[in-house]
Regions:
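Beta-strand-enriched cores of mature, soluble protein domains
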Residues: 1-151
Length: 151
């Protein structure tokens, strides 16, 4: 059986300037604060709460290992914790622009994630019973991620 993907929702969040901790043995540690945002899709709509971040490592080969954690709040007040692991890579020229916060064409960047969702709301339990993937786009002050459920 060939797996299929079902679109679930699109998330748009604003991010602050990265905190660059500098080189560590695994690469360059950067912490990108999440300032807030919105999400909307099939039966889900709400906001991205401020206070999350992406604790990323940029390896020597330019690949970014992403470890993003944040909280969503639905329009009816339900909370969803998100832990989103992923990778992002591009050519050295495009990666250099990304690191400087310059705009790049999203089609030149491979940006994929595998999120895990947690919620105590019974009507959102399905989020914890499926596998999801995300496709991302990075802009100077924003990130857009589209989440898909693996059927």
């Amino acid at each position: 059986m060939t797996p299929e993907l079902e679109f679930v929702f699109e998330l748009r969040c604003q991010v602050g300037p990265p905190l660059d901790l500098g080189p560590i043995p695994a690469g360059r540690r950067r912490i990108v604060p999440i300032l807030g945002g919105t999400f909307e899709g099939s039966g889900l709509k709400g906001r991205v709460l401020p206070g999350g971040a992406d604790w990323q490592i940029v390896r020597a080969d330019g690949l970014g290992e992403l470890d993003t954690r944040y909280t969503l709040e639905t329009d009816d007040g339900k909370l969803i914790y998100v832990q989103n692991a992923g990778i992002r890579h591009a050519s050295p020229e495009v990666t250099a622009k990304l690191m400087k916060g310059e705009p790049v064409d999203p089609s030149l960047v491979y940006f994929r994630t595998v999120p895990k969702f947690e919620s105590s709301a019974p009507e959102l339990a399905w989020l914890m019973r499926s596998i999801f993937v995300g496709t991302g786009e990075r802009y100077p002050a924003d990130v857009v991620i589209r989440f898909w459920k693996l059927q």
